[in-house]
Design a protein with these regions (language model features):
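Beta-propeller domain segments
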Residues: 1-127
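Hydrophobic residues at beta-strand termini and immediately following loops
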Residues: 34, 130, 162
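Conserved loop/turn at the beginning of each blade in beta-propeller domains
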Residues: 56, 132-134
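Short leucine-rich amphipathic alpha-helical surface patches
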Residues: 107-110, 134, 141-144
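Short glycine-rich, acidic/polar surface loops and turns
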Residues: 126, 137-139
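Blade-level signature of beta-propeller repeat domains, shared across WD40, Kelch, NHL, RCC1
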Residues: 139-165
Length: 165
């Protein structure tokens, strides 16, 4: 409650290392800049920018809000202090150096100094690597106990649980 609906946008295929992966906050009737949302230029007039971005061409596949009962690091999940999301990053098959294959933590905080934030929606963000070299992770989910689960593409389809233990 308090943040709204979140969705990811992996950009267009065949754009090389452009554009960035996006985390967007859904707003009714909004335009999100596609296909003119180039990371080297300002958000096109009349559109809404992402509330967070990540390494281009790595595919943010799944995203989930960290529940308040989770022992994993994160914010309080309220409009005053901010929210923490976790996302699986599948990785790129189309780069010289491997990228992705990780889980990232996304802290969404109220924009400071009465600014509109990076998206124009009143939020700022910080994205950090949480777990690396996790294979090619499929969408992740938190369970009712606050533990984080993910599976990987290929191999044996093992389901992994991430806790603080």
């Amino acid at each position: 409650d308090g943040l709204g609906y979140i969705f990811t946008d992996n950009g267009r295929d065949w754009e090389g290392d452009h554009p960035y992966e996006e985390v967007n906050l859904l707003a009714e009737g909004a335009a999100y800049g596609w296909p003119d949302d180039d990371p080297q230029h300002p958000v096109p007039q009349g559109t809404i920018g992402p509330i967070a971005t990540w390494t281009p061409h790595t595919s943010l596949n799944g995203i989930d809000l960290r529940p308040v009962n989770s022992q994993l690091p994160g914010l309080a999940n309220n409009p005053q202090d901010g929210f923490t999301l976790y996302s699986s990053v599948y990785g790129s098959w189309n780069t010289i150096l491997p990228q992705g294959q990780e889980i990232v933590r996304i802290d969404i905080t109220p924009a400071q100094n009465n600014s509109d934030g990076i998206s124009g929606q009143g939020w700022d963000s910080k994205v950090t690597r949480f777990a690396v070299d996790v294979g090619t992770p499929l969408p992740l989910r938190f369970d009712a106990n606050g533990d984080l689960y993910y599976a990987t593409f290929g191999n044996d389809g093992t389901l992994y649980r991430i806790t603080t233990e």
